[in-house]
C-alpha cells in the first residue's frame, strides 16, 4: 500500500476497524500510510475516537456501515439444519443460535489447541440455562470456514469449529437428554446458506461480529459476546451494536451473570427488538449503499468531507 502511495496512486481505506496502534513497533510507518489515504471509511463511529486517542489524523475519516449489512441470504436454502429449526418450532420451543471462537475464550492465544475442558465452564452453564429455563433449543454453528484452493476447491471447517465441536461434546456428555435439544452444524456452509439458516432462528448469541450482522440484518435479536481483553483488544462488538441501538446486549465473556442476564433480557424482549431492527436496518442498509457514491467522488477528486 505504501509503495502505491509513493508512486502517486490515490488510495482509499474502506470498511475498516483501524488499530490498535498503542504497541505497534512500526508506528511511524503505520501513521505515514494512514495519513496518506485520501479517504478512510470506518465501520464503527467508536473508531474515530480511538484514532484521535492514538494520535492519528481524522480529517479524512468518515463513517459508513459495514457492507456486510447488504449481503443477501439464499432464501431457497433448505437442509437438515433448517428442518431441525422447523421441528423446534413445532414443539413450541424457540431456536437460539450460538457461535464463538478463540477470541472469546478465557485463555489465549486465540488459536490455542487443544483446550482444557475447564475453559468451557461458563458457556456450558449458559447452554444448560437456555435449555432448562428458557424453553429453547440450541443450534451451534461455526461462522468462520475455510476452503481448499482451486483446482480442488471445496469448503472446509475453520478454526472455530474445533472449539464448538468440543463445546457440543462436553454438553451432551454431561446429559444425554441434551442431544434432543442441541444441534451441531457439522459441515461448512456457503455464506449465503449460513445467513439463511441464521435468519430462521429466533435469537442469536455470538462472539463473531459478522454473525451478528447476518442476524440483525434479518431482524433477528442478538446478544454480542465481546472478545476477551486478555486475548485481544477490540471495540468491534460495541461499535457494531451501538449503530443499531443494540449496545445493551453486549456482554463480557467469562462473566456468567452478565451473560445470563443479557441473554434473558434479549429473550424477554424478542418482539420489541425485532420491531426496533425492522425500523433501523433499512436505514443502515441505505447508508451502506450511499458510501459507494462518496468513494467514487473521492477517486474522481470531487468529494467534500
What do these predicted ranges mean?
Residues 1-305:
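Active-site anion-handling motifs in enzyme catalytic cores
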Amino acid at each position: 500500500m505504501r509503495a502505491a502511495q509513493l508512486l502517486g496512486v490515490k488510495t482509499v481505506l474502506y470498511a475498516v476497524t483501524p488499530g490498535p496502534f498503542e504497541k505497534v513497533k512500526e508506528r511511524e510507518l503505520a501513521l505515514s500510510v494512514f495519513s496518506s489515504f485520501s479517504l478512510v471509511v470506518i465501520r464503527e463511529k467508536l473508531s474515530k475516537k480511538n484514532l484521535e486517542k492514538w494520535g492519528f489524523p481524522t480529517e479524512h475519516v468518515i463513517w459508513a456501515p459495514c457492507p456486510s449489512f447488504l449481503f443477501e441470504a439464499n432464501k431457497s436454502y433448505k437442509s437438515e439444519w433448517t428442518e431441525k429449526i422447523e421441528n423446534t418450532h413445532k414443539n413450541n420451543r424457540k431456536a437460539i443460535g450460538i457461535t464463538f471462537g478463540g477470541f472469546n475464550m478465557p485463555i489465549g492465544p486465540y488459536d490455542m489447541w487443544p483446550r482444557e475442558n475447564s475453559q468451557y465452564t461458563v458457556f456450558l452453564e449458559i447452554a444448560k440455562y437456555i435449555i432448562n429455563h428458557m424453553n429453547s433449543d440450541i443450534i451451534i454453528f461455526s461462522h468462520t470456514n475455510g476452503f481448499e484452493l482451486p483446482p480442488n476447491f471445496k469448503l472446509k471447517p475453520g478454526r472455530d469449529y474445533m472449539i464448538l465441536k468440543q463445546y457440543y461434546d462436553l454438553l451432551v456428555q454431561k446429559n444425554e437428554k441434551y442431544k434432543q435439544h442441541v444441534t451441531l452444524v457439522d459441515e461448512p456452509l456457503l455464506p449465503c446458506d449460513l445467513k439463511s439458516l441464521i435468519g430462521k432462528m429466533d435469537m442469536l448469541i455470538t462472539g463473531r461480529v459478522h454473525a451478528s450482522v447476518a442476524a440483525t440484518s434479518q431482524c433477528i435479536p442478538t446478544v454480542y459476546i465481546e472478545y476477551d481483553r486478555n486475548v485481544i483488544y477490540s471495540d468491534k462488538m460495541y461499535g457494531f451494536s451501538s449503530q443499531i441501538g443494540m449496545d445493551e446486549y453486549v456482554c463480557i465473556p467469562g462473566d456468567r451473570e452478565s451473560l445470563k442476564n443479557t441473554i434473558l433480557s434479549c429473550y424477554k424482549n424478542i418482539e420489541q427488538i425485532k420491531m426496533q431492527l425492522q425500523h433501523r436496518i433499512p436505514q443502515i442498509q441505505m447508508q451502506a449503499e450511499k458510501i459507494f457514491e462518496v468513494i467514487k467522488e473521492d477517486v474522481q477528486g470531487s468529494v467534500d468531507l
